[in-house]
């Protein structure tokens, strides 16, 4: 039981009521105020804002032999927990630590600070309110009572950085109560990273818009090249940014437009002060990602490559051919596993793609993983196609959305092909066209 004193809680509410009355606001029902005084308050009932299906989470916890899933956040340090608990809404301040425990059986429980005691009111369960650090420690001890193993956003040896969100000190605090902490990676994949029907529909619309913008950009690059109009990477990028606005897309960044040696840097970004001209007979890589401007929308993310001349040099064509084969191998592996209802993990997809590139003699030119999760952020928290930068052992589950984007990088150019894959119950779908070859723009007949 928390030792947060009832009379102190009541004084807080009385002060808040007085301020509200002085400002002309209404005074809440005093009985409702008293109901929030110590542990044991209702959290207000599930109103549908929380993406978690608590009974389904509890089934998963029991299947994995875990006693609970302990969500924790401080000041936005754990965006996974914040999103699951829906504390990211406008007008909400999250400057204090909160915990929310979903036990394998029984009622969820929360531990919240007195000045932000309503932040978890949308969630099912009961809460304890604390103010000082002694009350926090007592409340946490009560919250963890009887538990042996809980899942948190933690990854052993930081193997999956996207999951490793809880700081080492908080892990010590939990483990100091005799509780073993396990990774919540598989739980996050299932309950935070999988798309519902609305998310999939938003992704499709975003993808369709990105492909149209890509076509317009290729047309602009080709036309300017043929007409000998001086054009910088930044010029094309800003045209594309305007088309994003026209299409109702938002993004965390303007698109990548990278010519020749700049395409050898996978995360090159042209800016007004640093941008090269796009010359004749040069390769140009476009990487563009965006989502609809609506709550819950998920990203689409594609990469295509063109050439401003008539004939693509053999060196570039061979490299792209290997990238295309690696991409297609990864996609086919996912499709086959889905059809056969066979378990597949992120690292296996990456390894399959990289083996194609290595067998083609390009192993030394691989700089990154094969793909990443897609979500409301372009790099989502779900399973990544990665056995290169990390070892992502999480399973690909129905509802997963992710990229497949093998690339090769040399001193004078780089090539990459990026597509998006959605995993349905019975089929894996690539949500857009696949590039077959580097597109030569020197002809008036541009093939996309």
List each model region and its residues.
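Active-site neighborhoods and metal-handling regions in enzymes and metal-associated proteins
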Residues: 4-18, 22-448
């Amino acid at each position: 039981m928390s030792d947060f004193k009832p009379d102190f809680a009541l004084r807080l509410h009385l002060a808040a009521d007085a301020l509200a009355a002085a400002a002309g606001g209404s005074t809440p029902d005093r009985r409702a105020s008293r109901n929030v005084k110590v542990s044991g308050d209702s959290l207000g009932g599930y109103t549908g804002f929380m993406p978690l299906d608590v009974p389904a989470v509890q089934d998963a916890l029991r299947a994995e032999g875990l006693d609970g899933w302990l969500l924790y956040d401080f000041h936005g340090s754990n965006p996974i927990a914040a999103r699951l608990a829906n504390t990211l809404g406008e007008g909400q301040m999250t400057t204090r630590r909160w915990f929310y425990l979903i036990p394998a059986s029984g009622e969820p429980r929360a531990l919240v600070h007195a000045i932000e005691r309503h932040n978890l009111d949308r969630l099912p369960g009961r809460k304890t309110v604390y103010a000082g650090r002694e009350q926090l420690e007592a409340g946490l001890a009560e919250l963890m009572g009887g538990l042996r193993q809980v899942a948190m956003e933690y990854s052993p040896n930081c193997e999956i950085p996207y999951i490793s969100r809880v700081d080492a000190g908080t892990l010590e605090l939990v483990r100091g109560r005799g509780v073993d902490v396990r990774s919540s990676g598989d739980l996050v994949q299932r309950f935070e990273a999988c798309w519902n029907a609305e998310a999939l529909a938003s992704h499709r619309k975003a993808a369709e818009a990105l492909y149209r913008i890509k076509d317009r950009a290729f047309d602009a690059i080709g036309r300017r090249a043929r007409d000998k109009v001086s054009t910088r990477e930044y010029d094309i990028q800003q045209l594309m940014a305007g088309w994003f606005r026209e299409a109702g897309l938002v993004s965390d960044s303007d698109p990548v437009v990278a010519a020749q040696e700049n395409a050898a840097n996978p995360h090159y970004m042209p800016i007004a002060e640093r941008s090269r001209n796009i010359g004749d007979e040069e390769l140009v890589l476009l990487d563009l990602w965006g989502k609809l401007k609506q709550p819950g929308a998920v990203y689409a993310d594609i990469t295509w490559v063109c050439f401003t001349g008539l004939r693509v040099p053999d060196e570039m064509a061979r490299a792209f051919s290997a990238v295309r084969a690696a991409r297609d191998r990864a996609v086919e592996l996912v499709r086959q596993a889905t059809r056969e209802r066979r378990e597949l993990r992120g690292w296996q997809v990456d390894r399959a793609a990289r083996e194609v590139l290595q067998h083609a003699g390009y192993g030394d030119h691989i700089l990154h993983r094969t793909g990443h999760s897609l979500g409301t952020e372009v790099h989502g928290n779900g399973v990544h196609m990665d056995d290169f930068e990390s070892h992502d052992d999480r399973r690909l589950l129905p509802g997963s959305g992710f990229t497949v984007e093998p690339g090769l990088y040399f001193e004078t150019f780089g090539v990459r092909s990026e597509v998006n894959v959605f995993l349905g119950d019975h089929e894996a779908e690539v949500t857009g066209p696949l590039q077959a070859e580097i597109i030569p723009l020197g002809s008036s007949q541009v093939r996309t």
